[in-house]
Swiss-Prot record:
GO terms for cellular component: extracellular region. InterPro entries: Kiwellin-like (IPR039271), RlpA-like_sf (IPR036908). Pfam families: KWL1. Its main location: secreted. Residues 1-18 form the signal peptide. This is Putative ripening-related protein 5. Belongs to the kiwellin family. Keywords: Secreted, Signal. It is found in: Secreted.
């Protein structure tokens, strides 16, 4: 479900901008962090801590490092990459690592862009060297790179913008969990593209999602697939080879997809998209 957020520019020790929702039912702070000023890098107009000021904390899952390498891949990301960091509650202890989210600006002509979740924006810790002496993130922040701002046609100097965001693709089955190649659902129907080795969960988690998109896969070798029958939680093993129409089988969640050989590849085609 899409939510309403604000976009905010942050320091390069984090990603350079953030998304912050302003939906109803705001969370109450779980505590307050005493402010402590320091050598705060101000190149991207960050919210630097002030001595004696109390900053709200929002404890969800345990907070991690808000600066340095990204939590998801232990790597740094350039300003030109379409990447974001989620505040602690949404980050959910790395559960959303690698997810692709579509961000739509209320300003900038309503442009949208798809970005990858690579890090956490710490809602608990801050005002120290590890966090560039910046205040903790709010409970509703999505920290975004300058490339996201540019793609949305927004002025980074404003510092905060209203946006909506949700899991990409919206209105389509969320294809996810590919450990070698990330399938791109935006490609034209009928176009082949490499999928690669699949991990959990590969094709979504609800019957409604499953009805939205049909995929046809071409398997170069026999593969064993364990899948669940609807809500019965009954596992069935299916050995298949050649062309495979995913919507032929009565399951809502692929529990596991095991390749007969570790590095065997398969190809998939989006063959139809139902109107919701």
């Amino acid at each position: 479900m899409a939510m309403i957020f604000l976009l905010a520019a942050l320091s390069t020790t984090h990603l350079a901008s953030s998304l912050r929702p302003v939906a109803a039912g705001a969370c109450r702070p779980s505590g307050y962090l005493p402010g402590k000023s320091g050598n705060c890098e101000k190149s991207n107009d960050p919210d630097c801590c002030e001595d004696g000021k109390a900053y709200p904390q929002y404890r969800f899952e345990k907070g991690k490092d808000g600066g340095g390498p990204s939590e998801c891949d232990n790597a740094y990301h350039s300003d030109g990459e379409l990447v974001v960091a989620l505040s602690t509650g949404w980050f959910a202890g790395t559960a959303r690592c690698g997810h692709r989210v579509r961000i739509t600006a209320s300003g900038g002509g309503g442009r949208s862009v798809v970005a990858k979740v690579v890090d956490e924006c710490d809602s608990v810790h801050g005002c120290d060297g590890e966090h560039n002496y910046e205040a903790p993130c709010g409970n509703n922040i999505v920290d975004a790179s300058p490339a996201v701002w540019d793609a949305l046609g927004l002025d980074k100097n404003v510092g905060m913008e209203h946006i909506t965001w949700g899991r990409e693709p919206q209105g389509k089955i969320p294809v996810q969990g590919f450990s070698m190649h990330q399938l791109n659902p935006s490609q034209s129907p009928g176009k082949r593209f490499l999928v690669g080795e699949i991990s959990l969960p590969p094709f979504g988690s609800s019957s409604r999602e499953w009805e939205m998109v049909s995929w046809k896969c071409f398997l170069p070798a026999f593969m064993s697939i364990n899948y669940l029958h609807g809500s019965s939680h009954l596992r069935t093993k299916l050995n298949i080879k050649g062309e495979w129409q995913l919507d032929r089988y009565p399951f809502t969640t692929l529990q596991q997809h095991i390749l007969s050989r570790k590095f065997v590849m398969l190809w998939c085609i989006q063959v139809k998209k139902n109107v919701l």
